[in-house]
UniProtKB/Swiss-Prot annotation:
Pfam families from the UniProt entry: UPF0102
Protein name (Swiss-Prot/TrEMBL): UPF0102 protein BT_2236
Signal peptide as annotated in the record: none
Family to which the UniProt record says this protein belongs: Belongs to the UPF0102 family.
Domain of life: Bacteria
Length: 121
């Protein structure tokens, strides 16, 4: 596995552990259907939480959350809509970003709640 893939997987594992420690129920990880993809689907207090995870070894060039641009937001919203239809979920949904910065399990985690709202298409 490529080094950046290993870092991404470790970051996602750290994000899941963080969410569980903070009372979130993890419904799915790396959910895919067709061309739709969601990193983490969680639930807490009757709310569905869609989490985009961005992992970087450092922030020399950019902050990880800057990688979540408008096209990525639109894809994530469409994927969340497909997920909710497939599983017949009718609760409020929130879109969060978790940034994971560091290496070798020594991570700094930042949870950005309500990081974005569904855009008007």
């Amino acid at each position: 596995m490529a080094e950046h893939n290993e870092l991404g997987k470790a970051g996602e594992n750290a994000a899941v552990a963080y969410l569980e420690e903070h009372g979130y129920l993890i419904r799915h990880r790396n959910w895919r259907k067709g061309h739709f993809e969601l990193d983490i689907v969680a639930a807490k207090e009757n709310e569905l939480v869609i989490v985009e995870v961005k992992t970087r070894s450092n922030t020399l060039f950019a902050q990880p959350e800057e990688a979540v641009d408008l096209p990525k937001i639109k894809r994530t919203v469409r994927a969340a809509d497909a997920y909710m239809k497939l599983f017949q979920i009718d609760v409020p949904v929130r879109f969060d970003i978790i940034t994971v910065i560091g290496e070798n399990g020594n991570f700094r985690i930042d949870h950005i709640k309500e990081a974005f709202y569904p855009p008007l298409f």
